[in-house]
């Protein structure tokens, strides 16, 4: 039984010099194969003029289905329309052998590379996947009336933290999901306080709302994974009347790859990655977990970090271990650490020129975390600026020396801090009167580097007064 005659499909676009070059070839193929040749045009349906039966593929449906990357592409098809083989670009001998037309394009140049398919235009892959690919989304679609303002609709539905959000359209969410290899329906964990199952898709939706770029998404996912660790005690943190909220410190190559700020104004405004990664976690807590102010969130005052509290560590000094390295990771690891912290407390010391003096000075500020007379209750982060770091470095001190000196300076006799001492009712219980106490538990003081190179200023982020095993501990997540 003779083999079935193959059919051919040619995909072209007018805006391609190589496609324009092979117009005579298209005419030859049409004469040879007649109805066995189909020509799909990605841009201008009037092209090619020599083949009036051309098929409009401006929707790119056919091109997407056949994964066309270069035009012209010539497909040889089985009788059922499935692909048998393909060639692309223009190579005279290859096309002659592929089609069996010995004189095909005889007067043309021997070779000319093809052009990029319109399916590869910037951003088009996600557009086509959304239009023609399998359905990925499990989240409920919200239809808006034509007269509804999309920005106001986000406020009215309670999706915002009080600032404008980016509407999470299917295309934006899909582009966010494309930034990870994890499945959209993978459950990361349950988000308190309502303990709602949280999928990768839900994280993506809130990352879009926060204004994240897709390349930030792995960091957002890692921060959510860290926040859901039992050691972090997110449920308790959300329910407390205290000031605290999640503080994110990011280490490793990712900070440079996505342009995070650990330098000038590191804890301030102006850096999109810093601002939106932290905000994504806060919005997720609100929109998925139900942690809404006035509801389960009954903070007496709160702090501005409940919008976003995220920064990169300055790792430019190779002799100074990063926070991630303190937690057992390597310098080349990308790591996000979460701390239950309050607002920022400035530390001014423009006079100390010796490590000993500066350590004593920093310790005085650290004593005031939560209250001068409350010890071993709240952890803290000490952010040391480059100029203060220089004082330690020039004095020959390592980070370990700084930590040891601070712990030594933070020891105090219980008689100084028990309730009623110095005429102040607040303080430690009477049972600590005859003890020597340290301001922080053994793993309660975390030293981080950040800030601009000008200014003898450092800072303290005080922790939740339920720090430690009874409440929240700093957690880290490699990604």
What are these regions (language model features)?
Residues 105-138, 145:
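Iron-sulfur (Fe-S) cluster-binding modules
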Residues 20-58:
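Conserved segment of the thioredoxin-like fold in thiol-based oxidoreductases
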Residues 2-26:
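Short active-site neighborhood of thiol/selenol oxidoreductases, capturing the structured segment around
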Residues 11-15, 40-44, 385-387:
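Structural motif
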Residues 70, 75-111:
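Non-catalytic, surface beta->alpha helical segment in thiol-disulfide oxidoreductase systems
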Residues 7-9, 35-39, 379-382, 445:
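Hydrophobic beta-strand segments of well-ordered beta-sheets in folded domains
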Residues 128-479:
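Non-transmembrane, aqueous-exposed alpha-helical and coiled segments at domain scale
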Residues 43-71, 76, 95-101:
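Thioredoxin-like thiol-disulfide oxidoreductase module
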């Amino acid at each position: 039984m003779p083999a079935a005659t193959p059919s051919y499909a040619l995909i072209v676009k007018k805006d391609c010099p190589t496609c324009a070059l092979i117009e005579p070839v298209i005419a030859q193929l049409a004469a040879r194969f007649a109805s066995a040749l189909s020509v799909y045009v990605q841009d201008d349906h009037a092209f090619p003029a020599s083949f009036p039966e051309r098929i409009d593929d401006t929707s790119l449906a056919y091109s997407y289905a056949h994964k066309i990357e270069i035009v012209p592409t010539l497909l040889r098809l089985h009788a059922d329309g499935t692909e048998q083989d393909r060639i692309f670009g223009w190579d005279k001998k290859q096309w002659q052998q592929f089609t069996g037309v010995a004189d095909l394009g005889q007067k043309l140049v021997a070779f000319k590379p093809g052009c990029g398919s319109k399916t590869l235009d910037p951003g088009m892959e996600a557009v086509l996947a959304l239009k023609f690919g399998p359905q990925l989304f499990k989240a409920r679609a919200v239809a808006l009336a034509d007269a509804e303002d999309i920005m106001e609709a986000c406020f009215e539905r309670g999706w915002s933290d009080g600032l404008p959000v980016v509407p999470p359209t299917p295309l934006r969410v899909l582009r966010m999901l494309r930034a990870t290899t994890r499945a959209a329906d993978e459950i990361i964990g349950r988000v308190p306080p309502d303990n709602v199952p949280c999928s990768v898709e839900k994280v993506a939706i809130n990352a879009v709302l926060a204004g994240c770029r897709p390349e930030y998404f792995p960091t957002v996912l890692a921060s959510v994974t860290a926040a859901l660790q039992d050691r972090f005690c997110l449920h308790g943190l959300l329910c407390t009347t205290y000031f605290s909220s999640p503080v994110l410190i990011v280490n490793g190559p990712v900070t440079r790859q996505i342009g995070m700020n650990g330098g000038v104004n590191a804890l301030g405004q102006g850096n999109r990655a810093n601002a939106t990664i932290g905000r994504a976690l806060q919005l997720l807590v609100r929109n998925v977990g139900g942690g809404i102010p006035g509801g389960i969130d009954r903070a007496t005052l709160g702090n501005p970090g409940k919008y976003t509290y995220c920064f990169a560590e300055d790792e430019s000094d190779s002799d100074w271990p990063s926070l991630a390295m303190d937690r057992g990771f390597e310098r080349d690891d990308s790591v996000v650490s979460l701390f239950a912290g309050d607002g920022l407390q400035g530390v001014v010391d423009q006079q100390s020129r010796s490590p000993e003096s500066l350590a004593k000075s920093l310790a005085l500020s650290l004593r005031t975390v939560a209250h001068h007379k409350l010890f071993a209750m709240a952890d803290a982060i000490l952010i040391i600026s480059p100029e203060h770091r220089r004082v330690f470095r020039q004095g020959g001190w390592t980070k370990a020396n700084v930590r040891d000196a601070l712990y030594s300076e933070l020891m105090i006799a219980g008689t100084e801090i028990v309730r009623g001492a110095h005429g102040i009712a607040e303080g430690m219980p009477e049972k600590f009167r005859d003890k020597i106490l340290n301001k922080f538990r053994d793993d309660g003081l975390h030293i981080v580097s950040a800030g601009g190179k000008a200014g003898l200023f450092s800072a303290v982020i005080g922790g939740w007064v339920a720090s430690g095993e009874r409440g929240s501990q700093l957690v880290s997540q490699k990604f």
